[in-house]
Regions:
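Short, solvent-exposed amphipathic alpha-helical segments in soluble enzyme
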Residues: 108-111, 137-139, 200-201
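Alpha-helical linker/hinge and terminal dimerization helices associated
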Residues: 30-50
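PLD-like (HKD) phosphodiesterase/transphosphatidyltransferase domain
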Residues: 44-121
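Amphipathic alpha-helical interface segments
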Residues: 162-216
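Residue-level signal for threonine
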Residues: 20, 102, 124
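Basic, Lys/Arg-rich alpha-helical nucleic-acid-recognition elements, primarily the DNA-binding modules
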Residues: 1-37
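Short His-Asn-centered micro-motif
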Residues: 94-98, 122-125, 153-154, 164, ...
């Protein structure tokens, strides 16, 4: 405490110490540093699955990333985070949402489509086939909606990229099981610009699904 007082980071105020303006600045810097270390720790095991845009972000923006990682006791943490974001958006455009992410959220997705949320999903044919065969009636009902568009693409990146009203989500999948391993969401403008370009690139090459051809 004496050293902090000598540096004029704190001052005595009655029977307690309070931070001075320089001390408050030091606290802010330390909190930012701790946030960055915590973000790095959470991302450590999935860095290699993330797009370059995340690694290229200035470290000062790391505190603006919300990182949700699955663990053995809470394997659906990324799914739950995505579902909470889905509840608050009026649009969803997603490249490679994957079965592991969308299947647990199907009820919520259906509710949001019924509420008028505009949804476009671009995924691999096998993923669409899963929903068409597992939930044939529900899939047929969704496909009849004018605010629900499903497209297929054969060559997608290994991660998912989603655009919501005010957030961008990046989902990482476990290579062997396909489970949602982690999710990053943020409102950093550079990430949103990147996500928009990813969506537009794959959207331009995507094809409408043909349910009968997929099932056959």
């Amino acid at each position: 405490m004496n050293e902090f007082e000598d540096r004029r980071w704190i001052r005595k105020d009655g029977h307690q110490y309070v931070a001075t303006p320089p001390g408050e600045a030091i606290v802010s810097v330390m909190e930012d540093a701790i946030d960055r270390v915590e973000t790095e720790r959470e991302l450590r095991d999935v860095w290699h699955r993330l797009p370059d845009v995340v690694g290229e972000l200035p470290t000062e923006t790391w505190s603006e990333l919300t990182v949700t990682v699955a663990d053995p006791e809470l394997p659906y943490r990324p799914v739950n985070r995505f579902e909470s974001l889905l509840e608050r958006t009026t649009t969803l455009r997603f490249v490679r949402p994957e079965v592991a992410l969308m299947d647990p959220c199907l009820n919520r997705l259906h509710e949001r489509v019924d509420s008028g949320v505009d949804v476009t999903l671009i995924d691999r044919p096998n993923c669409h086939l899963y929903f068409l065969t597992t939930y044939p009636e529900r899939s047929a009902e969704l496909l009849r909606r004018t605010n629900f568009t499903v497209l297929q693409h054969d060559d997608l990146p290994p991660y998912g990229t989603g655009l919501l009203d005010d957030r961008v989500v990046i989902s990482c999948y476990e290579q062997d099981s396909g489970m949602a391993q982690a999710m990053i969401d943020t409102d950093v403008p550079a990430v949103r610009d990147w996500a928009r370009s990813v969506y537009e690139r794959y959207r331009s090459d995507a094809r409408p699904i043909e349910p009968r051809q997929l099932v056959d």
